[in-house]
């Protein structure tokens, strides 16, 4: 067959510069019957793969033999596929596809949502009885900047020493009724979200809060405590809650002990028990510590502290590990080098 001889000659010509011996063996195949010639061609490939020659040269020869072997096979045996390339659908490389997006949704949405409910402040905290009085030099209270950003000093200067005091008369001295009345009053004052977002959590006196008609939680807590104490509702409690990663100073609200239950009177909400308050705030933020201050007209005492158990952040690294493993599993067939 003339076409077959041409294929063998071209193959020999390409291999000759690399190995004259192999090229001559290929030329001799022209004189053999087609079946014997094909088997001998396969033997030449096997001989080349096992011969000790430089690997780069060996690879070049094998590539040439494979290329022309495919042509010979198609010419002689259309049904054989020793050399023929498998008919595999072409895969297009896509960095992001539906599977990747689904995995990212699981890793960064569902998984964090689930794990965030595993740890809860209510499920593990330590109650520490403190009973330590909070003090601050009265002479320093005359300098507003000395306690502008200090919540504890602000309580001492405004509640104990009366700086920035307001005179508001309530309609009742009943603790619950008085607490509800003050709560409704402070809830009518707009919340200063701009100051909260800015991170500059300075403390206002009750007079400043009333005069400016705006404030944040610490301002409303101090105002509520001062008004209640001024109306002979005593003692008043201030609950200071600290959150993980919060730079604004946490959240403060006033409270009263009524019939053995601590009731919270927070801005913009109805009265709730301390337990209900913790349940609500624990769902919104990661609570790290709750400080309970006991206030009278003559003293500010850190009564007790509820301290959350330390939470390990080691499990958060599962995000990255899961993502890398997921990408490897999903994309391994497209990334041919894996």
From Swiss-Prot:
Major localization listed first in the record, in broad terms: membrane
Membrane disposition: Single-pass membrane protein
InterPro entries to which the protein is assigned, alphabetical: Transglutaminase-like_domain
UniProt keyword list: Membrane, Transmembrane, Transmembrane helix
Gene Ontology CC annotations of this record: membrane
Top-level taxon: Archaea
Compartments where found: Membrane
Transmembrane domains' residue ranges: 100-120
Family as reported in the entry's similarity comment: Belongs to the UPF0252 family.
Protein name: UPF0252 protein PF1496
């Amino acid at each position: 067959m003339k076409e077959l001889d041409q294929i063998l000659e071209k193959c020999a010509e390409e291999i000759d510069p690399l190995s004259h011996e192999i090229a001559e063996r290929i030329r001799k195949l022209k004189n053999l019957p087609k079946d014997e010639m094909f088997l001998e061609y396969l033997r030449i490939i096997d001989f080349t793969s096992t011969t000790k020659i430089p690997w780069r040269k060996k690879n070049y020869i094998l590539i040439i033999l494979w290329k022309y072997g495919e042509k010979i096979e198609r010419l002689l045996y259309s049904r054989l596929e020793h050399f023929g390339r498998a008919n595999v659908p072409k895969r297009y490389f896509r960095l992001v596809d539906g599977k990747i997006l689904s995995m990212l949704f699981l890793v960064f949405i569902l998984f964090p949502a689930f794990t965030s409910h595993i740890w809860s402040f209510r499920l593990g905290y330590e109650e520490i009885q403190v009973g330590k009085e909070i003090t601050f030099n009265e002479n320093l209270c005359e300098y507003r900047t000395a306690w502008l950003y200090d919540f504890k000093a602000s309580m001492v200067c405004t509640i104990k020493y009366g700086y920035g005091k307001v005179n508001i008369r309530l309609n009742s001295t009943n603790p619950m009724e008085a607490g509800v009345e003050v709560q409704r009053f402070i809830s009518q004052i707009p919340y200063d979200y701009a100051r909260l977002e800015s991170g500059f959590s300075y403390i206002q006196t009750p007079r400043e809060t009333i005069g400016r008609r705006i404030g944040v939680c610490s301002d409303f807590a101090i105002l509520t405590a001062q008004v209640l104490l001024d109306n002979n509702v005593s003692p008043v409690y201030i609950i200071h809650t600290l959150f993980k990663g919060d730079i604004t100073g946490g959240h403060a609200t006033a409270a009263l002990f009524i019939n053995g239950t601590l009731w919270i009177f927070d801005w913009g909400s109805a009265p709730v028990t301390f337990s209900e308050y913790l349940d609500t705030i624990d769902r919104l933020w990661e609570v790290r510590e709750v400080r309970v201050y006991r206030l009278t007209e003559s003293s500010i005492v850190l009564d007790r502290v509820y301290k959350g158990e330390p939470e390990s952040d080691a499990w958060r690294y599962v995000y990255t590990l899961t993502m890398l493993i997921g990408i490897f599993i999903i994309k391994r067939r497209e990334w041919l080098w894996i």
